[in-house]
A protein has these predicted regions:
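Transmembrane helix-loop-helix hairpins at lipid-water interfaces of multipass membrane proteins
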Residues: 1-37, 61-115, 196-200, 302, ...
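Hydrophobic alpha-helical transmembrane segments of ABC transporter permease domains
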Residues: 2-3, 66, 74-78, 84, ...
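Juxtamembrane helix-loop junctions of ABC transporter transmembrane domains
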Residues: 26-43, 66, 74-87, 108-155, ...
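A short amphipathic helical element positioned immediately N-terminal to and/or at the very start
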Residues: 43-57, 158
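An intracellular "coupling" helix at the cytosolic face of ABC transporter transmembrane type-1 domains
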Residues: 55-59, 147-148, 164-173, 177, ...
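Helix-loop-helix
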Residues: 91-100, 193-207, 277-356, 361-362
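ABC-type nucleotide-binding domain
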Residues: 363, 370-371, 377-632
Length: 632
């Protein structure tokens, strides 16, 4: 075997250098921008933030580390025991001795299996708790984002961050980190064991490391790119599905099913191609590493067999059949962790990429935040004042231009105007759904920016243009999961707003199921439920945004009756399409292009024959035309 020393030494030296290179390639960071993973956060920063979530569970990780030592010990010791058993079998041996060695091996195997099982159970439970905490933090943070920010971020993207990306992170806690450490120590331990057993054969094994390094570096480059494509395509298809499933009725109305199907097919095919590329990369890497493993085994069998037959020895150590068997097992245990390290590192980078996406949402500063000296609003009279308020959704494109008006407590004020005049925007600003750029908005003489947002919104009952009902029951949608509200109180409120007239006809009453977005109820029924939901929380100011749009005449009469009753609750601000519903308002404010052009009572504005008169006349003639068409 000494004849092969020059080749073995050269190969081993190259192997050691290559091992250092692979460590540098996989461990040393190459800056923030990495191939296939465009990132803005450093790995160390991401890891630190992830560890902050793991810190409360450090005891569990200590136990896992202790259990992992048994698995590492088994991987290192078991080949030596099997080699010893093989030597006993081929030579003269006592049956008791063989039994003791076999029993010892079985005991170590059982202990290792038990440790691996408990390690997996602890990691799964701990990892899921960590990810559950992260998801909760993410959801709570999303709830704090302003309306403007929620409008900018697609719903599908938020869903992907909360589900797919957190699942990718969970893999790191349940598998990757522990196995990365385990594989690293197994490689070191096996290398030391092989050197201790026979360094000549160890040199032979090291000769194959340069090829593993080459394959791993190439694999790293392409696999990370493939990971990124899969993630981007997954986010894209989730966003598309979220949007188009919500708008499926529009798709059907305009007969766009085929066109939408083609778009979905394109996105689905893009995801399929990305996944195929990922499978192809892994499918090439694994056989190549397996080929190196087989090559090293063949070299072991040739060199080991030749040395065994020739009785070659080194430093007085004879090359035995048991040693060859041990090395055969060591080679398998040496190559598997190296292959796993390459793959697991890329999965880890994928988890880091997902973590950065999650943290990018968590790092979004809510645009609506309480001022440091914000006060708690205990009770309000309902006096509202706008003082030269300017607002724009897009910088420079003013939606409101110097709007000023005053609302006395208990008054009912209506806002009218053409689409885009700023009616709904005014109502959104009062509740601080958006932040205005100039001027002041006062509630009982207090600037709303000096009031805590939660405290402010508790005093307002908001009914937005699009009435949103959650999946659940009528009861859960009215109380919004708030405890302490009895069914009697709920029915009293429903009776107050005339919602009981259709609830009592339902098979399950308050327990009637509500499907997604309340699509099993009519627009008018959803509006009445929205009234009940608002009133039951006892607001001081009622905000009705286009409350009587798109409903039947019978339900409109019920809603008008409800609105008359609600005037007694407190200050009421109304935006309505049908001007007939606001004739009894204390004051009507007419807006055009973001400015107040008229204000007064219904009769005063009609007498002035200005913008309100034009809108009212136009709507009156349209309603008369609709009635005549209906008679025909």
């Amino acid at each position: 075997m000494h004849n092969y020393y020059p080749i073995l030494w050269v190969g081993a030296i190259i192997g050691v250098i290559s091992t250092l290179l692979i460590v540098a390639a996989f461990v040393v960071k190459d800056g923030k921008k990495e191939t296939g993973f465009e990132r803005n956060m450093k790995d160390s920063e991401i890891m630190q933030r992830l560890m902050d979530y793991a810190k409360p569970f450090y005891r569990q990780f200590i136990v896992v580390g202790f259990l992992m030592l048994f698995s590492i010990a088994y991987d290192i010791i078991s080949p030596l025991i099997v080699g010893k058993i093989e030597e006993l079998v081929v030579g003269k041996f006592a049956l008791n001795t063989l039994f003791l060695w076999v029993a010892g091996y079985a005991a170590i195997l059982l202990v290792s299996m038990a440790c691996t099982y408990f390690q997996a159970v602890i990691l799964q439970k701990t990892g899921q708790k960590i990810i559950s905490n992260m998801r909760e933090d993410l959801f709570v943070h999303i709830e704090r984002l302003s309306h403007e920010q929620l409008n900018e971020i697609p719903v599908g993207k938020l869903v992907t961050r909360t589900t797919n990306d957190t699942n990718a992170i969970s893999l790191m806690f349940t598998n990757l980190l522990v196995n990365l450490l385990k594989n690293f120590f197994v490689i070191i331990g096996i290398l030391i064991a092989m050197l201790f057993l026979n360094y000549e054969l160890t040199l032979m094994v090291l000769c194959f490391v340069p090829f593993i390094v080459l394959f791993s570096i190439i694999f790293r480059k392409f696999s990370r790119r493939a990971h990124r494509k899969v993630k981007d395509c997954t986010t894209d298809i989730n966003t598309y599905l979220s949007e188009n499933l919500s708008g499926m009725k529009i798709t059907q109305i305009f007969n766009r099913e085929d066109a939408k199907m083609r778009e979905f097919t394109d996105k689905s095919n893009a995801l399929g191609r990305a996944q195929q590329e990922q499978i192809f990369v892994f499918g090439i890497f694994r056989p190549l590493v397996y080929m190196l493993y087989i090559s090293s085994v063949l070299c072991l069998l040739y060199l080991g067999g030749k040395g065994y037959l020739e009785g070659t020895s080194f430093l007085g150590q004879t090359l035995t059949s048991g040693m060859i068997v041990s090395f055969y097992m060591y080679i398998s245990k040496f190559f598997n962790p190296i292959q796993n390290l390459a793959e697991q590192f890329n999965w880890l980078q994928s988890a880091f990429a997902s973590a950065e996406k999650v943290f990018s949402i968590l790092d979004l500063e809510p645009k609506m935040q309480d001022a440091p000296d914000a006060i708690e609003l205990t009770d309000i009279k309902g006096e509202i004042e706008f003082c030269d308020v300017w607002f724009s959704y897009i910088p420079g494109e003013w939606v409101l231009k110097g709007v000023s008006f005053h609302v006395n407590p208990k008054e009912t004020i209506a806002f009218v105007g053409s689409t885009g005049s700023g009616k709904s925007t005014i109502l959104s600003l009062i509740c601080r759904n958006y932040e205005f750029q100039k001027g002041e908005i006062l509630i009982d003489g207090i600037d709303i920016r000096k009031i805590k947002i939660d405290s402010l919104r508790k005093k307002f009952g908001q009914m937005l243009q699009d009435v949103f009902l959650f999946s659940g029951t009528i009861r859960s949608n009215i109380i919004l999961r708030e405890e302490g509200i009895s069914d009697e109180e709920i029915m009293d409120v429903c009776h107050y707003v005339n919602a009981d007239q259709f609830i009592n006809k339902l098979d399950h009453g308050l327990d009637e199921p509500v499907r997604e977005r309340g699509n099993n109820f009519s627009a008018g029924q959803r509006q009445l439920l929205s009234f009940a939901r608002t009133i039951i929380h006892k607001p001081s100011v009622m905000i009705l945004d286009e409350a009587t749009a798109n409903i039947d005449t019978e339900t409109e009469l019920l809603i008008q009756d409800s609105m008359e009753k609600m005037k007694n609750i407190g200050t009421m601000l109304i935006v309505a399409h049908r001007l007939s519903t606001i004739q009894h308002a204390d004051e009507i404010i007419v807006l055009s292009h973001g400015k107040i052009v008229e204000h007064g009572t219904h009769q005063e504005l009609l007498a002035a024959q200005g913008r309100y008169y034009q809108l009212y006349t136009l709507q009156y003639h349209r309603e008369q035309s609709e009635k005549q068409s209906g008679r025909k």
